Amino acid sequence: MAWGFSDIPEVVVDYVRGVFAAANDKVSRAMDVYPSMHEESLDHLLIMELTAAPPAFFANERIGVAIESHWLGGRWMWHRWEIADMAFFVILRRHGHLQIRKVALLQTKRLYSREIPVPELERADFEIGIGRIADRTDPSRPLSTRRQFTFDGGCVYGAIHAGDHQMDAIDAYFDDRGIPVYYGFYNPTWLPYSA
């Protein structure tokens, strides 16, 4: 019998939502403490939190569930474009046999504070991906300099806006493959926020 989403017991859905909510909370709290944290570090923190969630067994439903996460950042997935930063798999088994596997691709963007300029990105930033960080030569502030970070409704998510080439590539990927790519937005636990 083929399983659909409606066949997944509510207790399992609640468990998976809880694991993702706890991981999201951990990442948001990291932005509270380290407001200038790089997006890639936030990606790794999210993956670490999800990976740390052990598989769970629901005795009444006789179902085991595991969540697997994989970082994809920097990989060319579509015509030399990075389409997603990470992939998640939610796997349900009964008596050791696969019942259903759900896959989600996630493209993440972080909210930039008023004090951190949103970097001007070039096409190569998306084509090369994370490897582009090694090319940076821009000056940085001394670590001993005190800084203020303010997040409010006027802040923007870096590298995402209507008509953006990366967003166009993600849309084309979906049209061709039929695999949706979701957007994850990193921000502090509340707005406005200042640290």
Task: Give the location of each predicted region.
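Nuclease-adjacent, charged terminal/linker segments that flank catalytic cores
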Residues: M1-S6
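Acidic-basic catalytic patches of nuclease active cores, encompassing PD-(D/E)XK
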Residues: V11-H70
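Acidic, metal/cofactor-coordinating or nucleic-acid-engaging core segments within structured domains
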Residues: P55, L111-A195
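Short connector loops at helix/strand junctions that flank enzyme active sites
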Residues: W81-D85, R101
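Conserved catalytic cores of phosphodiester-cleaving nucleases, focusing on short active-site segments
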Residues: M86, A104-R110
